[in-house]
Amino acid sequence: MFYPDPFDVIIIGGGHAGTEAAMAAARMGQQTLLLTHNIDTLGQMSCNPAIGGIGKGHLVKEVDALGGLMAKAIDQAGIQFRILNASKGPAVRATRAQADRVLYKQAVRTALENQPNLMIFQQAVDDLIVENDRVVGAVTQMGLKFRAKAVVLTVGTFLDGKIHIGLDNYSGGRAGDPPSVPLARRLRELPLRVSRLKTGTPPRIDARTIDFSVLDQQHGDNPMPVFSFMGSADQHPRQVPCYVTHTNEKTHDVIRNNLDRSPMYAGVIEGIGPRYCPSIEDKVMRFADRNAHQIFLEPEGLTSNEIYPNGISTSLPFDVQMQIVRSMKGMENAKIVRPGYAIEYDFFDPRDLKPTLESKYIHGLFFAGQINGTTGYEEAAAQGLLAGLNAGRYSAEKEGWAPGRSQAYLGVLVDDLCTLGTKEPYRMFTSRAEYRLMLREDNADLRLTEVGREMGLVDDARWARFNEKLENIERERQRLRSTWVTPSTASVEEINTMLTAPLSREASGEDLLRRPEMTYAQLTSLSAFAPALDDAQAAEQVEIQVKYEGYIARQQDEIEKQQRNENTLLPATLDYRQVNGLSNEVIAKLNDHKPASIGQASRISGITPAAISILLVWLKKQGLLRRSA
C-alpha cells in the first residue's frame, strides 16, 4: 500500500549524514520523511566517541555555519574539548571533542523530533521506486510505499554489510544491527558503479579493570573551546580526562604470530580499508621499525564504564584481542566488553554524481556519507547537509548548489570525490585544500552563513548573531585603524614594554597588531587602545584579519585567477569525440567523468594543460564558452 501523504524529500538512514540531510531539507520548508531501521539509533556513534580533529573540525564548523546540527550536538555532549595544532597558524588549528555517546544521540534525537516539516518513521527500506530514470519513492520492509520528489541515500556501512572477527564472519550493518541486503541488491541493478570498502573498530574495555594509576592523563583545554558559533562553554557537561598507554614488543609479537588468523592477511576481506586509520595489524606490519604505538584510552560517557582504546582497531580473533589488550601497561587485567571487528560494505563510485551529490543517471536520487566512499562522522555530516539541501532545492524545482574548493572544505571534499573518485575510504585533511589560509575554522561562518541564509538553512537567531559579529569586526577594525600613537605619546613606555623594538614612528592600532609579538589581548590592555571587544569571536577575527592581511590578499588573487577556468562550464551532453585535437586517452577520460567545468576537468588524472587549451578554443569557436555566476 501507499502511505496516504506524499513527501518532498525522503532520507533513507539515520546516521550522521541522514540526520543532517533530514534537518537541512526540513529547515528549507520541504515536507521531509526520515526512514530508519531503528529510531533508537538516530545519530549513533558507531565507532569512536569523538567529533572533530584536523580537517574534520573544519567540516563541523562549516556544517554549523550552514545551520547544521553536529556542532550544537557535540557542545551538549562533549566531555573533553581541545584545540589541536594550537601553537601553529590559524589555518590548521582544529577543534576536537570527546563525546558522551548517550548525550550526543539524545541531542540529535531531540533536535530531529522538534524540527518542523520532519516526520520520522521506523522501517528498513528494501527498494526504490524508479520511473523513467527518475526516483519517485521508496518501499519499506513491510511493503509500505512512500512517494517523494527526491530521495537521499545515507545508508552507511549497511549495504550488504559483512562483519569479520577472525576467520568467522556474518551479515550485519554494524555490531547488533542487521544489514540492508535487499536494498543493496536493488541498487546493484541500477546503472551505477559499485565496489566494496572495509572499516574496523577496536574492542571496548571495562574501565573498572584498567589500572589508570600507572598511566599518563590527558586533560582538555582551559578555557574550554566551543564548536558551534551559537554555542557556549556553559552547555558542556562535566569534563573528564583521557589516558595514554602504548603497545610494546610483546603486543607486536602476539600480532605477528597470529597473522594467519587475520581475515585481512588471510585474504578473506576483499574491501580496502582506511589508509589514515589502519588496524593494529597493519600498523605493526607497515611500520616494522616502530617498537611502540601510542594508544589513547577514551571514555565513552559519563555514565558508562566502557573505554574506547583509540589505536587498536582489529579484526583478529577474540582470544588474540584479549592477548593484545592485556599486553599493554595498565591493561594487564583488562576485560573486553565488546570485541573489535572489521566490516565490509558496498559503496558507489562518487564520479557518477554531480557536485550537488545527485546521481548523473537517476534524477532526484542523492547519495551522502560512506556510500560515497568516505570515512568519518564529519565527512558524512557535511555530505548529508549538502545532499539534503540539494534534494530540497530539487523538489522545489530550484537549481542545485555546491561550494567551490576556495569556498569550503566541503567544496574540496565533493570535488575530490566527484572528479577523482576514491579506491579507499576518503578522510579529510587540511593538506587536501589549496587555499587553506582562506578555509579556517574561525571564518566558516563568514564564508557560508550568508549563502545558508539565502537557501533557507539559517534561522533568524543565527542570522542576527552573524550580523552582530560582522558589525563588531568592522567597528573594531575601524577603531584600531583610526587610533594612533607616536614616540612622544604619554603611554609610549607602556607600549614599548610589549614590543621587541621601541616605537620609532607614528603607528595605528592595526600597525601594532601586525607585529608578531603583539596579540589583540595585549594591545587592548594598553590604555591607548582599550577597551577590548566583549565578543570573543569578533576579537579573534580582528586579530587574524590584521595579522594575515597580506597573505590573505595574495591567496585571494590566486583564487580569482583560478576562478576563470573553474567557472567555465562544459555541456553535460558533450561527446568529446567531437573536439578535434584531443588524444584518445583524454577523450575516453572526459567522456567517462563528464566534468561539469574546465576546472573540474583539469583535476582529472591524465588531462594535460594542452588538452584544456584545446577545449577552451573549441568552446569559443562553437559559441559555447559560458561561465557560471
From Swiss-Prot:
Q: Could you say which cofactors this protein requires?
A: FAD
Q: Which keywords does the record carry?
A: Cytoplasm, FAD, Flavoprotein, NAD, tRNA processing
GO CC annotations? Answer: cytosol
Record Pfam families: GIDA (PF01134), GIDA_C_1st (PF21680), SAM_GIDA_C (PF13932)
For this chain, one GO molecular function annotation is: flavin adenine dinucleotide binding
**GO BP annotations listed:** tRNA methylation; tRNA wobble uridine modification
Name used for this protein in its record: tRNA uridine 5-carboxymethylaminomethyl modification enzyme MnmG
* Source organism of this protein record: Cronobacter sakazakii (strain ATCC BAA-894)
Give the gene that encodes this protein.
mnmG
